[in-house]
């Protein structure tokens, strides 16, 4: 059967369950734009910047691992998308990007047979995007023969969705897009080419060994990571958690695996986690880490002191993660999280309750109650602004179950991941690895559309929103029920804190009005110009009233919360100056603001480092 190649691409996406596409149209992708835009089974959301397309697709996939395609044009269309794609690469998010390219006979690849040495470019707006994206994708290819399109599409889809997921990219010259192909002549892809790189199935001896180690441990901890969702193991994880009955610790990408009120949840560990979560890890004698790569943000920069009393069982689909030098892993398990947890659940169901688990659980719950992230002083009024910790805690505590939230970077992600109340079934999208400013608005768009256009909270910052401000219009155009809460801390607050800490003798630079070299607009005028109903708050009391009012209404809405520019991130890993003036990086049980040594000593089941 003869079909236009661009239509073949659109039909392929539909046949693989794709229903949504994010795109900015362009001449180099004209036939792709036509095919995708007129396919009755696809809804194309047109953004105002290609970075927003990529971020929206990345956040969309986080909801239930369904892929939304991205379609961009040649040259700047492709390069503009890179930040969103590298975010998906580092956080292991399945993404499918299709780009247009100049006519094949005007590409530098084609010209190479004549020039011998490569041209930088030959065609108008030509750029060989595959060379740039090969380090941030599982598969990237330019179609140099139309007959290769089936093979490329099938291989790309398979690699994006198997093993450790990630982005894939197919670049298609414009003359091939509009040309016709004979589908019966197309060569297919055999997954066996690449499946040899996948881990073997977990054997039952490994599972039984893990069960025995948990039985014999006095202070076991379940360190749950986002790989659990990526593998489709969320439901079985919940069953395993109940059966093991041991404390659960999460971190940024995985905060929504378990609700705050669960008697198993004890906290979020890491250099910007909370005290209870870190105390659980640092006091543990056994850690079962599933689907978490245990990044430096989780171990802290003094990683040799991380979980120093624990035997670590780490389950990961990427063999390299099990061997990196910043962690110690006594029992590496190279496996798919769903395969591992499914088999673990069957064995755990047979396991008799472990008597010491209740006492250890009670201890972690006591920490959670007595050492909350949001302190009483943060609820007090300062006369001019709201407190960002109080705001995040209050707003999130008012959300219903199964709510959707997209979180940008800076104050939004630090405070959001520390203080956000996760309700049962709630989802929170944030990108922790690349952590780019400008993430919040397009991520909220992807989260909302991926969540079947349910009401969505967008946590943005005054610095971050400027990176993708144009997406305010995308929300309006598509009538998306997104409620934007803008944290206004008068500039780049994370960098302000760094400059306060390290460069006190110098004046501030590049952070906002106080450095006299960077300024921001009046967001009330911006919001109203785009057509948003606007709210604001400048105190904790006003914040509570405004939040209650905003949450009762339908979006899109814009609510600006003016927050204290002196509020530091706390608790957090921080350099400590000893009495002799020496600077040291304390282990993660010792977060700033530092507790008295006697108090910390009572909390720890193991000796403090200065006692060893």
Give the residues covered by each predicted segment:
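Active-site-proximal structural scaffolding
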Residues: 241, 280-281, 388, 468, ...
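A structural micro-motif
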Residues: 42-43, 93, 246, 310, ...
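N-terminal alpha/beta PP-like core and its mobile active-site loop of ThDP/TPP-dependent enzymes
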Residues: 1-355, 398, 481-484, 504-505, ...
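Phosphate/pyrophosphate-binding active-site segments
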Residues: 1, 144-147, 212, 310-409, ...
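Conserved short loop/turn motifs at secondary-structure junctions
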Residues: 225-230, 380-381, 461
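N-terminal cationic-hydrophobic initiation segments that often serve targeting/anchoring roles
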Residues: 61, 160, 241, 396, ...
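Active-site diphosphate/adenylate-binding microenvironment
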Residues: 6-9, 14-19, 27, 32-39, ...
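Thiamine diphosphate
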Residues: 108-124, 271, 325, 332-334, ...
């Amino acid at each position: 059967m003869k079909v236009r190649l661009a239509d073949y691409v659109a039909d392929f996406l539909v046949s693989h369950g794709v229903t949504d596409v994010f795109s900015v149209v362009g001449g180099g992708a004209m036939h792709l734009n036509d095919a995708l835009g007129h396919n009755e089974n696809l809804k194309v959301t047109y953004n105002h910047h290609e970075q927003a397309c990529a971020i929206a697709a990345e956040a969309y996939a986080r909801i239930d691992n369904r892929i939304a395609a991205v379609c961009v044009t040649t040259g700047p269309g492709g390069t503009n998308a890179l930040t969103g794609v590298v975010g998906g690469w580092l956080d292991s998010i399945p993404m499918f990007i299709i780009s247009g390219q100049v006519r094949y006979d005007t590409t530098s690849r084609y010209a190479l047979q004549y020039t011998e040495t490569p041209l930088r470019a030959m065609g108008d707006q030509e750029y060989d995007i595959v060379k740039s994206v090969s380090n941030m994708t599982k598969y990237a290819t330019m179609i140099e023969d139309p007959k290769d399109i089936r093979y490329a599409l099938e291989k790309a889809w398979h690699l994006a969705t198997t093993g450790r997921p990630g982005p894939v990219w197919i670049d298609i010259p414009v003359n091939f897009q509009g040309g016709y192909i004979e589908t019966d002549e197309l060569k297919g892809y055999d997954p066996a080419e690449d499946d040899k790189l996948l881990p073997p199935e977990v054997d039952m001896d490994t599972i039984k060994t893990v069960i025995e180690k948990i039985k014999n441990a006095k202070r076991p901890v379940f360190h749950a990571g986002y790989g659990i969702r990526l593998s489709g193991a969320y439901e079985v994880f919940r069953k395993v958690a109940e059966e093991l009955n041991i404390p659960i610790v999460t971190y940024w990408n995985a905060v929504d695996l378990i609700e705050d009120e669960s008697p198993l949840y004890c906290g979020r560990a890491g250099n910007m986690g909370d005290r209870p979560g870190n105390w659980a890890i640092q006091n543990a004698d056994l850690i079962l880490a599933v689907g978490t790569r245990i990044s430096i943000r989780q171990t802290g920069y003094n990683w040799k002191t991380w979980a120093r009393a624990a035997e670590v069982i780490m389950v990961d689909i990427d063999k390299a993660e099990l061997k990196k030098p910043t962690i110690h892993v006594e029992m590496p398990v190279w496996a798919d999280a769903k395969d591992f947890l499914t088999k673990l659940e069957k064995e755990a169901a047979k396991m008799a309750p472990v008597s010491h688990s209740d006492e250890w659980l009670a201890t972690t719950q006591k920490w959670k109650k007595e050492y909350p992230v949001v302190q009483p002083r943060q609820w007090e009024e300062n006369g001019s602004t709201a407190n960002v910790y109080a705001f995040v805690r209050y707003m999130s505590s008012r959300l219903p179950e199964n709510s959707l939230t997209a979180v940008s970077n800076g104050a939004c992600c630090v405070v959001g991941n520390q203080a956000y109340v996760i309700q049962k079934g709630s989802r929170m999208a944030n990108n922790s690895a690349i952590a780019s400013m400008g993430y919040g608005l397009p991520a909220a768009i992807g989260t909302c559309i991926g969540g079947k256009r349910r009401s969505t909270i967008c946590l943005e910052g005054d610095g971050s929103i400027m990176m993708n401000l144009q997406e305010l219009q995308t929300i309006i155009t598509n009538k998306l029920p997104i409620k934007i809460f803008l944290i206004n801390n008068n500039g780049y607050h994370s960098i302000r804190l760094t400059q306060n800490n390290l460069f006190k003798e110098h004046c501030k630079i590049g952070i906002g009005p106080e450095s006299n070299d960077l300024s921001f607009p009046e967001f009330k005028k911006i919001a109203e110009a785009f057509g948003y109903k606007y709210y604001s708050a400048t105190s904790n009391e006003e914040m509570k009233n405004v939040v209650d009012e905003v949450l009762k209404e339908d979006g899109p809405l814009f609510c600006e919360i003016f927050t204290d520019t002196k509020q530091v991130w706390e608790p957090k890993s921080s350099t400590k100056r000893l009495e002799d003036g020496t600077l040291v990086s304390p282990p993660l049980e010792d977060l700033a603001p530092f507790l008295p040594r006697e108090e910390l000593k009572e909390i720890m089941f193991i000796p403090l480092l200065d006692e060893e």
